[in-house]
Amino acid sequence: MTLRMPLKSLLVLGLLASASVLAADTAKAPAAPVPLLWKVSDKDNAVYLLGSFHLLRPGDYPLSPEVEAAFADAERLMFELAPEEMQSPAMPQMMLQAALRTDGSTLQQELDAATWRRLEGWAGKNGMPVVSFNNFEPWFVGLTISIVEMTRQGLDPKLGLDNHFMDKAKAAGKPTAGLERAQEQIGVLDGMEATEQRQFIVEALDQAEKGSAETERLHQAWRRGDAEGLWSGMAADMKRQYPRLYRRINVERNDAWVPRIQQ
């Protein structure tokens, strides 16, 4: 595929995973990660595509020379969200506002008894009263579970690959842009049908219960640039168990991004 773009671009795209990454053994410094990096080019233009984890740890840096070389060669960077939106203090408030239930019902009334019990158990393990989730939509609670699991194991969004390259682009004076707006990204989650939202919270609980071995495997696959390992350990399960949710989060968003990349 030839992309007609006037500039060499680096696209930093996140891997959608409701999984956490373990802190590595610090006794031996690991080799620099070689994440998912592709180059698409013709005689005039080039696009680098880089797969990202949104939360990382200090041991994941520095990146491999190939990634740093792609950044140096790129004249502009594109992210899922533009830096001014992703790093805006208004972003969490926008998400919180969208997540509030407005029909007078509670989350407990919406979830089946088995899922509520699982949520109650997870909340208890993390020192949270489960009733604190009652005023929110399932998608927001599922996202909260994923983020808590990540940060509980030492991950830091400030160290995520997106923020890393946003900061580097700003320091280097390179233009940046987003493939979608914050409202669009929130709308993907908030616009899910009730069945999809309940699946989202179950998927988050499933990942939380799989524990450290699964998340370490995914992290190592990312560090190796192992696309097949990430697919089989993450996307394939979602596609098989929750096909409509998979289509909404992965397929439809990717389809919407392609014309913006080609511009």
What is the predicted role of each segment?
Residues 32-35, 257-259:
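Alpha-helical scaffolding within the catalytic cores
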Residues 20-22, 168, 260:
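Generic detector of isolated residues embedded in canonical secondary-structure elements
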Residues 34-249:
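Structured, acidic catalytic/metal-binding patches in enzyme active sites
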Residues 244-263:
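A cross-kingdom marker for long, charged
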Residues 21-25, 31:
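Boundary at the C-terminal end of the N-terminal hydrophobic targeting segment
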Residues 1-5:
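N-terminal secretory signal peptides that target proteins for export/translocation
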Residues 6-20:
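Bacterial N-terminal signal peptides
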